[in-house]
Amino acid sequence: ASHELKTPLTVILADSDVLLNHSTESISSQKKWIDSIQSEANRMRKLVENMLFLAKNDANRIEISMQNCSLSDICFHCVLPFESIAFEKGIDLIDEVEENIEVHGNESQLKQLILIFLDNAIKYTPSGGKIYFKLAKIQNKPVLTIRNTDSYIPPEDLKHVFERFYRVDKSRKYQGGAGLGLSIASQIAQSHKIKLSVTSDEKQGTEFTLNF
């Protein structure tokens, strides 16, 4: 965890040094460094929030209010903002959401859970790839699947994907993730008694399945 915090701090300090050394220049001419500081600060904020969530969860200090909510509506609202992101990256986001599917749970946490998987799929799908997002009832039980093509996870890594700070591709640290997202998803799933599973195939890609 200390290493994950140290990286953005190092960037912020380096960028602020550049600004201080060019203090007579206009703000517009130094926008690149200011944007970098803001980006790294936001990255730190997200990391701290995620670490606090996991710490509270470990200490059983998270109070969750459960109620009936529309999983269909939650999925729809989660997918919507990713459509433009996928378009910009040259990714085909194909969603199929069955209507009127309800579950008992915490709407905010369910949204966070789904956003983690969508963000993960976008992050690891290259341009020209596809993401399949599907919500349907199977044997009268809601099942959500998120599959992204051109993204293969070897068997030796697959069993670790829900562990904290674990990255399958160590070379992708620059993408800003801290390896906490799927761990948080796993904790939320446990609190909602959702069964998580993942499969990966070199031809078909990687698929996460959530059985409600």
Task: Write out the residue ranges for each language-model feature.
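Short acidic helix/loop segment immediately C-terminal to the autophosphorylated histidine
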Residues: 20-27
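Conserved catalytic submotifs in the C-terminal HATPase_c
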Residues: 65-68, 87, 92-102
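Conserved glycine-rich
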Residues: 193-194
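Short conserved segment of the HATPase_c
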Residues: 153-165
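Short alpha-helical segment of the dimerization/phosphotransfer core of two-component systems
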Residues: 39-44
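Short beta-strand/loop element within the Bergerat-fold HATPase_c
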Residues: 128-140
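Short helix-loop "hinge" at the ATP-lid/N-box region of the Bergerat-fold HATPase_c
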Residues: 121-122
